[in-house]
Amino acid sequence: MDASEKHTRFGGPSVFLTWDERYQNTWEGEVREPASFLKENISKLPKGKALDLAMGVGQNAIFLAENGYEVVGIDSSQVAVEKAKAYTEEKGVSIKTIKADLSTYTLPEKEYDVILNFYFLERGLIPKIKKALKRGGIVVFETYTMEHQKFDKPFNPNYLLQENELLLSFIDFKVIFYQEGVVESDGKKKAIASLLAEKVR
């Protein structure tokens, strides 16, 4: 799976079917390692209850569970959800999995200490993320920017961040870390924005 294609998953029922088909093929780049940005910042996160949005096969959710979190993971693909369940069993941890369309799903308010959003952009979710975090909770957010079009297949620009958009979207939070630019991973360049921010009120 090309993680960048996650941005198209809310295009309609045919997209959901395509994602189920993709997740059925393990050769489609199944990522089983947690995101580097998450691993690097795990010590900065408050303990408690965590939510992983668009979790895919659950690698980040499982990493949090292994580090003592009570974790909820949501994805639109039933196949991804089933794989996440299987991987949690392999790892000997437990996460609550939910199949849902995040463009319409209602998040409970003041419920989570940590919320993850990796390589998925649904702008309407940002206000929901803010409400779903407890005071003192932290959002961990990383996804592609417009500049990424230089390095990968054509993207729908609606699913790419504008310059400083992610930072400005959380201007009412205490920003612990923010970085935007081009990085290299596995010999490939990608343009991303990475944010760690705390809800202070």
Language model feature labels by segment:
Residues S77-V79:
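Conserved SAM/SAH-binding beta-strand->alpha-helix loop
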Residues E184-R201:
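Core SAM-dependent methyltransferase catalytic element
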Residues K91-L102:
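Conserved SAM-binding strand-loop segment of SAM-dependent methyltransferases
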Residues E70-D75:
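Conserved SAM-binding motif I beta-strand of class I
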Residues G137-Y144, H148:
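Conserved beta-strand signature within the Rossmann-like core of class I S-adenosyl-L-methionine
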Residues L107-V114:
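A short acidic, Gly/Pro-enriched loop at the edge of an enzyme's catalytic core
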